[in-house]
């Protein structure tokens, strides 16, 4: 029996990346970063702000707030 685990973090980040939804990333020190998610892995998020890329470590992130609602897809068809 195969157990499917839902990784909400990856689903959320992948959707904002694919749909080009602008986000505000709030860091644990209170700083805000705004831009588009270009990629991510287990430890980092790449954010594009006005053509400049920033590699942000996930342990420094407090909150990610999208500029519009994100359609969360929980099935295998949503993976790319």
Curated annotation (Swiss-Prot):
HAMAP family in UniProt: Hfq (MF_00436)
Name of the protein: RNA-binding protein Hfq
Free-text function comment from the UniProt entry: RNA chaperone that binds small regulatory RNA (sRNAs) and mRNAs to facilitate mRNA translational regulation in response to envelope stress, environmental stress and changes in metabolite concentrations. Also binds with high specificity to tRNAs.
Gene: hfq
Family: Belongs to the Hfq family.
GO MF annotations in UniProt: RNA binding
Any Gene Ontology biological process: regulation of DNA-templated transcription
Organism: Ruminiclostridium cellulolyticum (strain ATCC 35319 / DSM 5812 / JCM 6584 / H10)
Record PROSITE patterns: SM
GO cellular component, one term: cytosol
Keyword RNA-binding tagged: yes
Subunit structure: Homohexamer.
SUPFAM superfamilies given in the database record: Sm-like ribonucleoproteins
The organism's taxonomic lineage, starting at the top: Bacteria, Bacillati, Bacillota, Clostridia, Eubacteriales
Keywords from the UniProt entry: RNA-binding, Stress response
InterPro entries associated with the record: Hfq, LSM_dom_sf, Sm
Pfam families associated with the record: Hfq (PF17209)
């Amino acid at each position: 029996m195969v157990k499917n685990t839902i990784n909400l973090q990856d689903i959320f980040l992948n959707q904002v990346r694919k749909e080009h939804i602008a986000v505000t990333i709030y860091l644990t020190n209170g700083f805000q970063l705004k831009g588009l998610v270009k990629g991510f892995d287990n430890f980092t998020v790449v954010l594009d702000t006005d053509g400049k890329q920033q590699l942000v470590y996930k342990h420094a992130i407090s909150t990610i707030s999208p500029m519009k609602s994100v359609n969360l897809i929980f099935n295998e068809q949503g993976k790319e």
